[in-house]
UniProtKB/Swiss-Prot annotation:
Start and stop residues of the Sequence repeats: 124-207, 218-299
Signal peptide: none
Key word Hydrolase present: no
Protein name: Transcription initiation factor IIB
Biological-process GO terms, alphabetical: transcription preinitiation complex assembly
Database matches in NCBIfam families: PRK00423.1
Residues binding Zn(2+), per UniProt: C11, C14, C30, C33
PANTHER family, per database record: TRANSCRIPTION INITIATION FACTOR IIB (PTHR11618:SF13), TRANSCRIPTION INITIATION FACTOR IIB-RELATED (PTHR11618)
InterPro entries in alphabetical order: Cyclin-like_dom, Cyclin-like_sf, TFIIB, TFIIB_arc, TFIIB_CS, TFIIB_cyclin, Znf_TFIIB
Keywords in alphabetical order: Metal-binding, Repeat, Transcription, Transcription regulation, Zinc, Zinc-finger
Gene: tfb
SUPFAM superfamilies per the UniProt record, alphabetical: Cyclin-like, Zinc beta-ribbon
Superkingdom of this protein's organism: Archaea
Disulfide-linked positions: none
Amino acid sequence: MPEQEAFRLRCPVCGSTDIVFNEETGEYVCARCGTIVLDRYVDQGPEWRAFTPEERERRGRTGAPLSPTLHDHGLSTVIDHRDRDALGKRLSPRKRQEVQRLRKWQLRARIQTGMDRNLTIAMNELDRMANLLNLPKQIKEEAAVIYRKAVEKGLVRGRSIESVVAAVIYAACRIHHQPRTLDEIAKKLEVNRKEVARCYRLITKELKLKVPIADAMDHIPRIGEALKLRGDIIEYAMKIMEKIKGHPITAGKDPAGIAAAVIYIAVMQKGERRTQKEIANVAGVTEVTVRNRYKEIMKVLNEMDLEEIEKEVSKK
């Protein structure tokens, strides 16, 4: 590094060791007499800075980043499926046959064991399911890590890959406070709900996953966004949720059902037209659930002052 190099230099004119480095000109200059001690210095170090060993290791690594969502973490190479050479020209029939044969052998080299085959299928399925649910990268990676641990402990054996993948996705969503109900996941991914629930309970128990308790508050932004509600309505619903949080009426109830009922109350108070059926479909619950939770919550809110809640929201 230039700073370290400066300590070893000495001015040939005055003998001073107080040498400074000029980053703009690439010169080492004596701070006492101004003599240029060394010029045209080329810094061989990296152009980035790192403040921790972990950051230095991460930024210093060359090549593509490792990813748990790929069965081999992305370490192996893949022969391009397009039959073209480096200049973009199509290969001759003879060359295409040769490349096809190389692809086959390369695939066999990548997938050698039963675990490799399982992970290849599972990671492809995970990618497909995560795209259907519009999940962010961090949840996909969390789900992939959980699945790998389940494979290592032999929890996948005898169970369908689709059900296990759906279960680890549900667990990853819970861990990252991304509200997704089992019913929603089972419906969108077209898997058996009971089987997914069974796999989820097994995985969380055997892997000792610390999954936070589902919070109805987490469901409100998702439902509000899906219904394209105004920001003030969502904020009003969250204020209502704060008022009833911890109340006995919420104990043992489905968080999605409570959130749906609170959203319904908020849209009614704000004069927005939304039906119970519409809200229930988005929340992944039944109309009956929304109706029952609505009645219970309204009894509690009637003891409070809804206008006071609205004033609190308006002040912000």
